[in-house]
Amino acid sequence: LKGKPVAEIVNRDVELFIEDVCVKRRYSVSTHRQVVSAMKQFASFHPTCRIESLILERPKKSRFLPIVLSKQEVIDLLRNTRNIKHKAVLALLYSSGLRIGELLNLELNDIDVDRRQIFVRNGKGRKDRYVIMAESFRQLFHNYLMTYRPKRYFVEGPKPGVQYTAPSIRGFLKRACKLARINKKVTPHTLRHSYATHLLEQGVDLRYIQE
């Protein structure tokens, strides 16, 4: 606002400031929204501010359609993941719809193989829930346990009992996609979206998927 005293700032000054900061500098929608919110707070609480009824529109966040893998692409992805630990991680992300943080926090005693249940602690919204272990995952899970023998977590780093990391998962997922010749921008969350999409295609109730 070019050093203008707060008491002299009027609505038009704020509008021009927003335009200069956000539009001309091509800030992201999220940053634009933060600037608008900050200016509204400033106008509301500053004792000498003369701005009245400041109306600033927060730009709507862009809604991009999520990237989804086809069933064949999922098969190709897993076939090209040679390391059994990596394959177990990707298979569980897809077959259970877990978020990457939920998988990293998953402990062995949260997995009930006989009942095919996985207990997810502190999921989104800090809610606990159960997800079903796919029958097709059981043998891979057994082979993985026999090979790596993790101590506490479902997937661990080089040191026993220490959690694996998200960058490591993203790294081997990227390599597997390259080997499978999948040109989409695939992230661990893509596997979750793919899981939900494939359930919908099979006629599973949307409310069940959302839970």
Located regions from the model:
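Conserved catalytic core of the tyrosine transesterase superfamily
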Residues: 1-211
